[in-house]
Amino acid sequence: MSRPSLTRFLIEEQHAGRIDAELRQLITIVSRACKRISIAVSKGALGGVLGDAGTGNVQGEAQKKLDVLSNDILLEANAWGGHLAACASEEMDHSQPVPEQYPSGDFLLLFDPLDGSSNIDVNVSVGTIFSVLRAPKGTEKPGDEHFLQPGTQQVAAGYCIYGPSTMLVLTLGHGTHAFTLEREEGSFLLTQANMRVPDETAEYAINMSNQRHWEPAMQAYVGDLLAGKDGARGKDFNMRWIASMVADVHRILTRGGIFIYPWDKKDPSKPGKLRLMYEANPMSMLVEQAGGAATTGRERILDIQPTQLHQRVPVFLGSKNEVAAATRYHLDADKA
């Protein structure tokens, strides 16, 4: 029996009344853009796209050539379809409405065009993260303020990971599903329906080099993980860290674990490292739809009311019992 394609999956979701035709077509366009990005990434040094672009983004981060190229691919692919009202990206200071010569649709698209791009030059898996919101009714020219919706308002979220194989992981609010790109055919085929994150885990992903900058609750939590079966947790834990959120979260969706990027004192003015709107929110929706959990260490990420397009948050996501344990350390410390 042949595997269902992404196209068939989306049409069946539409027939079941879970999505409309416009959202189906938007996801199809995003998936096509991801195929183009996958081709560019896979060429590596042969494509002349490695290295810095010589520019910076709104976060003050140096842009890689592939950051800029991936951003341009997503913008161009979504400009003319008629399903989108505006886009927002990690690589752009402000949101961008669709060009006036094209019809405007009902949706807002946010994306990190190439997450983990600092790993590109060393050939580590990277990916595209995206989130879809509905434009508020009556909005003719959406601005940044129209994107400021809590993650619970997402109608779709996903990422495309460019690794040994290219995979699109998608949720439309009814489970999390993985599609693998069949390169000869050029189609994404369903390879894992209804992904499930185990409730329990003994694996965590964190950048331990920042340990000295963590708050006491975070120090205590990781200290107990490191103590293993001789400590308060009573079992041994393994640590993994790829420094590519897409790659780390993909591992967690596949076999469980907890991904952590906490607040730290290196720059106390920043509430976290990862961006809420196009990193934390879509990844949180994917993980929750797979039975996991996602918090800031104190509150559910999807409940946060954003105040800025490029707002940052701490992130704890993955196996729900371990996320609950990490959150408990922080809340108990707040009460002390």
From Swiss-Prot:
Known catalytic reactions: beta-D-fructose 1,6-bisphosphate + H2O = beta-D-fructose 6-phosphate + phosphate
EC numbers, comma separated: 3.1.3.11
GO BP of this protein: fructose 1,6-bisphosphate metabolic process; fructose 6-phosphate metabolic process; fructose metabolic process; gluconeogenesis; sucrose biosynthetic process
Disulfide pattern: none
Residues that bind Mg(2+) 1: E90, D112, L114
InterPro entries: FBPase_C_dom, FBPase_class-1, FBPase_N, FBPtase
Any one Pfam family match given in the protein's UniProt record, by short name: FBPase_C
Cofactor binding note from Swiss-Prot or TrEMBL: Binds 2 magnesium ions per subunit.
GO MF, one example: fructose 1,6-bisphosphate 1-phosphatase activity
Keywords: Carbohydrate metabolism, Cytoplasm, Hydrolase, Magnesium, Metal-binding
This protein's pathway: Carbohydrate biosynthesis; gluconeogenesis
Subcellular location: Cytoplasm
Similarity remark: Belongs to the FBPase class 1 family.
Assembly, per entry: Homotetramer.
HAMAP family the UniProt entry points to: FBPase_class1
The protein, known as: Fructose-1,6-bisphosphatase class 1
